[in-house]
């Protein structure tokens, strides 16, 4: 049953990420805004989930499943690599610092919101 919950959640999270990315593709910018926003909102939600007192099945469905499928570490690093190899160093460092710096802050904010 747990595997089904996680798998269903992952599918829902991936579909949500895909749809948001499609919407965001209309924004012409070198900065990968949609991946940035997806990862920050996912960090906040995972922080909230960690601070909350939800049951283990709900936590697995939402945390491992939905948010695991929604957030995207691999796309982040792929985009960072592309920026680096295209010598867009100012965007690379801004994206890197903002994603990891704000990611930690919003995860902490989510954690405290979930208490």
Swiss-Prot record:
The chain crosses the membrane at residues 1-21, 31-51, 57-77, 91-111. It holds the Pfam family CRCB. It is found in: Cell membrane. One of its GO terms (cellular component) is plasma membrane. Keywords: Cell membrane, Ion channel, Ion transport, Membrane, Metal-binding, Sodium, Transmembrane, Transmembrane helix, Transport. One of its GO terms (molecular function) is metal ion binding. It is a multi-pass membrane protein. InterPro entries: FluC. The keyword Cell membrane applies. GO terms for biological process: cellular detoxification of fluoride. Na(+) is not transported, but it plays an essential structural role and its presence is essential for fluoride channel function. Na(+) binds at residues 68, 71. It catalyses: fluoride(in) = fluoride(out). Fluoride-specific ion channel. Important for reducing fluoride concentration in the cell, thus reducing its toxicity. Belongs to the fluoride channel Fluc/FEX (TC 1.A.43) family. This is Fluoride-specific ion channel FluC 2. The lineage of its organism: Bacteria, Bacillati, Bacillota, Bacilli, Lactobacillales.
């Amino acid at each position: 049953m747990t595997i089904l919950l996680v798998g269903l959640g992952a599918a829902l999270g991936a579909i949500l990420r895909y749809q948001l990315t499609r919407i965001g593709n209309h924004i012409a910018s070198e900065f990968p805004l949609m991946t940035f926003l997806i990862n920050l909102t996912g960090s906040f939600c995972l922080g909230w989930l960690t601070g909350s007192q939800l049951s283990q099945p709900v936590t697995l469905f939402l945390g491992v499943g939905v948010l695991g499928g929604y957030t995207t570490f691999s796309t982040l690093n792929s985009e960072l690599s592309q920026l680096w190899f295209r010598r867009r160093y100012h965007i690379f460092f801004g994206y890197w610092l903002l994603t990891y710096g704000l990611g930690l802050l919003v995860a902490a904010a989510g954690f405290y919101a979930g208490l």
